[in-house]
């Protein structure tokens, strides 16, 4: 009899709970930024759930105006376009923050770049122009750690395609530098 009472009580609780109003918790929209370039605009949707430290770091540089009047300084068609760290005369901008911990193990596919030190990311970023799965996280060795993905292009892929096709050459010690600078006029948050 005791077990029947418990079962009836459990059913009553379940039924009663089903009458409570359901509260909708719509997910907050993902943050977006507009990269205004000399060749057009690119909108990137960021993923703070998968790469919170990387997104926070990137947005710090965005909001501080760090990227204003920098360039895409390395362009390799079939691979990526890299920017955010040099001015049009190829002077490297000084980073104001410490590198962030690499969040490459987040399950996203590669859209960002780093050196052989897995925790060296500061302000520079790149946008893949091909499926570069060899850059994805494989293990926690320097060569296998991968590159943290923190966003994706949602508008302006045609601009990315135009940038990846520019003529490039050498500039001092740098390779794959656009012969005509591709200016990042600004990067700003958008709704």
What are these regions (language model features)?
Residues 2-7, 14-191:
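Cyclophilin-like peptidyl-prolyl cis-trans isomerases
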């Amino acid at each position: 009899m005791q077990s029947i009472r418990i079962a009836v009580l459990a059913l009553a609780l379940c039924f009663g709970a089903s009458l409570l109003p359901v509260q909708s918790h719509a997910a907050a929209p993902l943050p977006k930024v507009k990269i205004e370039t000399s060749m057009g605009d690119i909108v990137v949707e960021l993923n703070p759930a998968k790469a919170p430290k990387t997104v926070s770091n990137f947005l710090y540089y965005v909001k501080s105006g760090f990227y204003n009047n920098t360039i895409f300084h390395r362009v390799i068609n079939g691979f990526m376009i890299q920017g955010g760290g040099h001015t049009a005369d190829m002077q490297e901008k000084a980073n104001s923050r410490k590198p962030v911990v690499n969040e490459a193990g987040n399950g996203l596919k590669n859209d960002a770049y780093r050196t052989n030190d897995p925790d060296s990311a500061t302000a520079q970023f790149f946008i893949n122009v091909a499926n570069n799965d060899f850059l994805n996280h494989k293990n926690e060795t320097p060569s296998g750690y991968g590159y943290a993905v923190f966003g994706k292009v949602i508008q302006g892929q045609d601009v990315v395609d135009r940038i990846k096709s520019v003529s490039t050459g050498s500039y001092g010690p740098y390779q794959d530098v656009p012969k005509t600078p591709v200016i990042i006029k600004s990067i700003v948050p958008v709704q």
